[in-house]
């Protein structure tokens, strides 16, 4: 699976969620991990936090990013 395809799949599966790595690289995580973790993550003010290998990773809701001017 290409990364861009995985991102599209992730967005479709997680109610308009985009991984933070698309906007600003935090850590590299395999797309399948992002998809499964986004479903289980905790949401707060448009941000989803979860832990991968002991490191905190964030997802951001697309509308949250648009409001902040991060994406068009």
Regions from the language model: what does each represent?
Residues 2, 55-72:
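A short, Lys/Arg-enriched interface patch at domain edges and termini
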Residues 5-37:
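Polyanion-binding surface elements
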């Amino acid at each position: 699976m290409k990364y861009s395809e995985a991102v599209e799949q992730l967005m479709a599966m997680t109610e308009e969620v985009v991984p933070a790595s698309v906007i600003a690289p935090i850590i590299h995580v395999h797309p399948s991990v992002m998809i499964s973790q986004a479903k289980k993550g905790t949401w707060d003010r448009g941000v989803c936090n979860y832990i991968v290998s002991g490191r905190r990773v964030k997802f951001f809701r697309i509308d949250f990013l648009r409001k902040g001017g991060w994406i068009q």
